[in-house]
């Protein structure tokens, strides 16, 4: 939020921090969650939202086969531009997004590298995280049996090699033989979302050996620890929480030396909807 005009102050010497800056806590990581279940924008609303995107973004949204996936993707792209515009204090139209060789989107204009963000959408929710200087990763999962699988047992057999023996033992805790049920599926998705959040934070996808990363999760507190290649990793802070009874969300936030033993702050914000405005900035539709 822009501050109002106030009394003028003498500028600090170049390279010196003011007392307020020295005492101010590090900026919190922004985390926005938008529930999109049941959102079916009219053609005019969708066209208005798409008009604010780059051509490459519009093409990515339209490539999704199912309408609900297109709606989630569209909402996510709009949220990205809204968050970046607020953080950099620019008009969304001034923002240009590009992708790394590994496919991770980043802000290319107006100020390259000034804001890190990551988006996830699955089930009923879209979640976006962002911070000016910390790498971030987020992944949301809905607790449901994947489409196209005949049984949970078949699904678990297919995914077994994505986890370390320790992780797999915790996921299958209490299982008898090959039989698995809803509690095991929930734990599966919790560990899976942690791995995904980490990979998204470091900007690597295909080619990373998932068994290199072994997570230990305290389900009560949501605090997770990562052992990477057999050694405790301290580069990132990991947290898992519930958006509702059917969805979990994992976040990975880069840890800075100045943080000491404190975990980076995460400021969660549940959005009521997406505002669609005309040329004069008048709200036409609250599209939630």
UniProtKB/Swiss-Prot annotation:
Its EC number is 2.7.8.7. InterPro entries: 4-PPantetheinyl_Trfase_dom, 4-PPantetheinyl_Trfase_dom_sf, AASDHPPT_N, P-Pant_transferase_sf. Pathway: Lipid metabolism; fatty acid biosynthesis. Transmembrane segments: none annotated. Its main location: cytoplasm. Signal peptide: none annotated. One of its GO terms (cellular component) is cytosol. The keyword Transit peptide does not apply. Monomer. This is Phosphopantetheinyl transferase. It comes from Thraustochytrium sp. (strain ATCC 26185 / S-3). The gene is PPTase.
């Amino acid at each position: 939020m822009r501050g109002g005009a106030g009394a003028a102050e003498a500028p600090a010497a170049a390279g010196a921090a003011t007392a307020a800056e020295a005492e101010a806590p590090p900026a919190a990581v922004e985390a926005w969650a938008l529930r999109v279940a049941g959102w079916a924008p009219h053609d005019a609303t969708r066209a208005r939202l798409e008009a604010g995107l780059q051509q490459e973004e519009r093409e990515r949204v339209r490539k999704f086969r199912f309408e609900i996936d297109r709606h989630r993707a569209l909402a996510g792209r709009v949220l990205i531009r809204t968050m970046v515009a607020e953080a950099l204090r620019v008009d969304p139209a001034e923002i240009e997004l590009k992708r790394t060789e590994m496919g991770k989107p980043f802000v290319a204009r107006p100020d390259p590298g000034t804001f890190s963000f990551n988006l996830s959408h699955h089930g009923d929710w879209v979640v976006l995280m962002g911070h000016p200087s910390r790498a971030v990763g987020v992944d949301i999962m809905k607790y449901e049996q994947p489409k196209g699988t005949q049984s949970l047992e078949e699904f678990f057999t297919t995914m077994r090699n994505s986890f370390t023996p320790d992780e797999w033992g915790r996921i299958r805790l209490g299982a008898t033989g090959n039989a698995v049920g809803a509690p095991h599926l929930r734990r599966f998705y919790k560990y899976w979302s942690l791995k995904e959040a980490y990979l998204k934070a470091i900007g690597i996808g295909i080619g990373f050996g998932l068994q290199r990363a072994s997570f230990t999760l305290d389900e009560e507190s949501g605090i997770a620890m990562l052992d990477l290649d057999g050694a405790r990793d301290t580069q990132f802070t990991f947290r898992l929480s519930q958006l509702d009874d059917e969805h979990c969300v994992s976040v990975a936030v880069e840890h800075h030396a100045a943080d000491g033993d404190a975990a980076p702050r995460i400021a969660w914000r549940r959005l009521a909807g997406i505002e669609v405005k005309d040329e004069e900035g008048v709200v036409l539709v609250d599209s939630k």
